[in-house]
Amino acid sequence: MSISLFGRIVSQQFSGIRAAGPGRSLYLPFTLLLKQPGAYKVSLHRYVHSTQTKSHLSFLMNNNDITPFQKFTVKVLKEQCKSRGLKLSGRKSDLLQRLITHDSCSNKKSSVKINEPKKKRILINDPIKITKKLVSDKTFRTIEKNISSLQNTPVIETPCDVHSHLQPRDRIFLLGFFMLSCLWWNLEPQESKPTIDH
């Protein structure tokens, strides 16, 4: 595709400033942006430490707290900023603003009373005064009950005690289970023997 053909296609779709080349004319699509009235005006704002310079001046003019800091030189202001952990770079007005805002914030923090939430008691009863007599009585009775309950029940059961309570249906079930397991055990070796075909 030649440049002149490309120029015709673009000129049909866009209207713009004609770019003069050696013997050829070409309409560029970005020229629409240049035709807009605000495209030539470029506004520049000077920012120092992410704050506009004009706002510094209005802040200093309106604030009455700067009088103690105005006497200091830039070097002393930087030392003050360093002692408070603030940024050290910038003009005198920047340093003044940082110091004043830091002091005003610290005054607000010190004047605010911090309310601690009340601790809630969950499932805790109020303390009760316990006497020695009360504790000794309860402990003795509890131990006594446990010992007497252990002495009443037999610890080891003998086989005759276990089998004495078998019912006739339990005996029939156990006998049938024993017979089936014996039959199954006898059939298993016959199935596992290899058969030899002649």
Swiss-Prot record:
Protein's UniProt keywords contain Transmembrane helix: yes
Chief location category: mitochondrion
Cellular compartments annotated: Mitochondrion membrane
Record keywords: Membrane, Mitochondrion, Transit peptide, Transmembrane, Transmembrane helix
Stretches that traverse the bilayer: 172-187
Transit peptide region: 1-55
An example Gene Ontology CC term for this record: mitochondrial membrane
SUPFAM superfamilies per the UniProt record, alphabetical: SAP domain
Gene3D superfamilies in the cross-refs: SAP domain (1.10.720.30)
Recorded superkingdom: Eukaryota
PROSITE patterns (UniProt xref): SAP (PS50800)
Domain SAP residue range list: 69-103
UniProt membrane topology term: Single-pass membrane protein
Family statement drawn from the similarity comment of this UniProt entry: Belongs to the AIM34 family.
Protein name from the UniProt record: Altered inheritance of mitochondria protein 34, mitochondrial
